[in-house]
Amino acid sequence: MPDGSINPWVIAVTVTLATFMEVLDTSIANVALPHIAGNLSASADESTWVLTSYLVSNAVILPLSGWLSSLLGRKRFYMGCVAIFTLSSFLCGFAASLGMLVVFRILQGVGGGGLQPSEQAILNDTFPLSKRGMAFAVYGIAVVVAPTLGPWLGGWITDNFSWRWIFYINVPVGILSLGLTYLLVSDPPYMKRIKLSDGFRIDYIGLGLISLGLGSLQIILDKGQRDDWFDSGFIRLFAVLMLVGLIGGVIRELKAKEPVVDFRMLKDRNFAISTLAMFFLGFVLYSSTVLIPQMLQQLLGYPAEMAGLALSPGGATIMFCMPIVGFLVSRVDTRYLITFGCTISASALLVMAGWNLSLDFKHAVLGRVLQSFGLAFLFIPINVSAFANVPREKTNMGTGIINLARNIGASVGIATVTTLLERRTQLHQMRLMDHVNNMNPALKTKLAGFAAASISGGSSGPGGAAQAHGMLFNMIERQATMLAFLDNFKLLGVIFFGIIPIFFLLKRPKMGGGSVPVH
């Protein structure tokens, strides 16, 4: 516990700095991939390992963060993560080849993986129960706003400077965070460092199995669509490794006296339901964050910077609403807050499922704002419920597990909507093409209009007819793609409505005790 003379809000800002940069890094590199590939003489497919390598190492460290905090001491572990993340960010910007960049991104993911769980545990010990909701609202703002800023900021930096600066910008923030953490943060009395010489044993087999399973899962999710899923021997190999690692790892950890990841925490009903809810929250949040800018660019012709800006008002909405939810969470039944948030967000997604190719930028922004308003009512209440009955000494372990659930949900969600987008587009194209026949009077009218436009543009004869058919096919392709986007929005809305009943299985938290970290 920090010295009482230190303002706890200063500590909150200190530990939020590095977490904001880490979450930002999960999305900021996406738009820079073509520049990275060109500069480092790599193919487009090879350059995607810049993303995959970070996600794999990050996913492996997340559930281990609680165990590592106990082993090393939480402050020491957190500062080590900040130092590794900062140094590897500099090395990423300095990389002279794709291989070097991938290695440094793995290291960056290792450093970043422990930041969020450690920050949540630090905030939990820094603030009294009555103020934790507001404290974790600050953290929640950083976690939600950073992914929405990432694509826009990455594009702006790449266009105006160099792709290397998307990594260099982490360095001064990391150094500042490291210095402030050293001066301001300390471990609470109960959080004593466990030394190996005192008999603390490392379950190397469990550690290896969990790492193998999570790493393989992340590779499958990141590469599956590109390699046509299980038609690829590469994906089948990693599917086998994933099953061996996860099944073997869970069995091993359930039997271990000192588990690396304590899955026994899922015996607590509130923690188990909240972990499942966090999976779906990650699924819907990150999927929609990918879909909206992609739709605006691909179908409506907006530049990348404008498409990214469409998400910003949603981030501002969450920034405004999070403190209000932090105030309400100790006064209103969390089950009602969660139900309200799910209902609003699901309704917004179903409204999006009614969009068409005449959509303007304003209505796209309004849809995201409405969805974000609902999302703001989910993060804090879900986690208040999750940790209501978790012993304080288990907080570090629990934050790692629930963060992992959210990140896996995000990866599964993005992989799902990306696959559905391609396959539903093909399906809708086939259905629309069924209406293309010479006996269809509407088709004749449309072709005549296209032909007239071609002739007025200088084409004539067979060339004009061919151009008219090309214009018709482009129209069908755009319409089919739009329908596929709408199918995805509908799916996400149905998921959010579908999970509402499980929240009424939660036991209402007693606000007088328990630990309340928020993700």
Each model region followed by its residue ranges:
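Small-residue-rich alpha-helical segments with characteristic i,i+4
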Residues: A146-P151, S288, A364-G449
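Helix-loop-helix hairpins in multi-pass membrane proteins, especially solute transporters
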Residues: L62-L207, S232-G233
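Structural signature of transmembrane alpha-helices in multi-pass secondary transporters
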Residues: E22, L51-Y54, N58, F85, ...
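Hydrophobic transmembrane architecture of multi-pass small-molecule transporters
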Residues: E46, N407-G498, I502-R508, G514-H519
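Symmetry-related core transmembrane helices of the 12-TM Major Facilitator Superfamily/SLC fold
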Residues: F167-Y182, F238-M242, D487-F504
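Transmembrane core module of solute transporters
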Residues: I6-S70, Y78, G99-V102, S162, ...
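Helix-loop junctions on the cytosolic side of multi-pass membrane transporters
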Residues: T181-G199, I251-V260, L357, L427, ...
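Small-residue-rich segments within alpha-helical transmembrane domains of MFS-like 12-TM solute carriers
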Residues: V23, S27, G93, G109-P117, ...
